[in-house]
Amino acid sequence: MPWSPGSSSAPSGDKDDIKSKLSSWTKPIRDHLSEGGNWIAPIIAAGATMGFWSFYKTYLRRIPNSAHVSPRYFHRRSLFGKVTSVGDGDGFHLYHTPGGRLAGWGWLRTVPKLKKELKGQTIPIRIAGVDAPEGGHFGRTAQPFAAEAQKFLDSHILNRRVRAYVWRRDQYDRIVATVYVRRPPFFQRKDVSMELLKQGFATTYEAKTGAEFGGPSKEIEYKVAEEVARQKGKGMWSLEKGGGFFHPSKKARAIESPMAYKRRVKLAEEPQRKLDS
């Protein structure tokens, strides 16, 4: 009767034959691995694979929305992408395009244009260090120059590629970031927060908690830019100066900062919130 090779009852001759065959099959492998130099290629290949995967996760993997922005990014990383919409004077949505043109964005890979394709695929960005006039949301009266601030930001960054240095996540799940854009004709890198302040379309952020400027030096630079715009009567600050000699009917008026406006509105709406609850 035939004997199973693994049977304990198999003839000793068959066992020896099996061992001999196994040894002959594995000997070339053992001989190959016994030479130290033969380990180099597999080790390099494994290291290269791990290195590429790490590089991909860190620099080339697209982040679809703010929920996927890890806290380890804060104060360490930046996000490069295209601005798909501007919501108000200090906020917009970013479609992350890691690697930029070198990674094929714009010629091999395209940014969606339809709203349904962009849904859940963009990161809401809150521009750091500044506060633009509040728009008329939820039936509230808009602040003066809210529309002008949004129009300026729209013309400055919409459909352009920007780099956002991320600092933290705010209470509305937006990513607070210092944003830079390059614009023609010389394509110098411009700090968007600074540009808003220079035009008088924002104040420096006033909240005692949660303020993010990207460093003490930035906060000082922003406050200086705000004061210069105020002295020149730029944007919202023109209301403080009135109409001057040529428009005497336009009286000078005090400016309510965006933060003061939000505090006033919150206080006025508090009784209604208590009734609703």
Swiss-Prot record:
It is found in: Mitochondrion; Membrane. The keyword Chloroplast does not apply. SMART domains: SNc. The active site is at 126, 134, 174. Ca(2+) binds at residue 131. InterPro entries: SNase_OB-fold_sf (IPR035437), Staphylococal_nuclease_OB-fold (IPR016071). One of its GO terms (molecular function) is metal ion binding. Its main location: mitochondrion. Residues 77-239 form the TNase-like domain. It is a single-pass membrane protein. The keyword Cytoplasm does not apply. The chain crosses the membrane at residues 39-56. Its EC number is 3.1.-.-. Disulfide bonds: none annotated. It is an enzyme of class 3 (hydrolase). PANTHER family: EBNA2 BINDING PROTEIN P100, SERINE_THREONINE-PROTEIN KINASE 31. This is Probable endonuclease LCL3. The gene is LCL3.
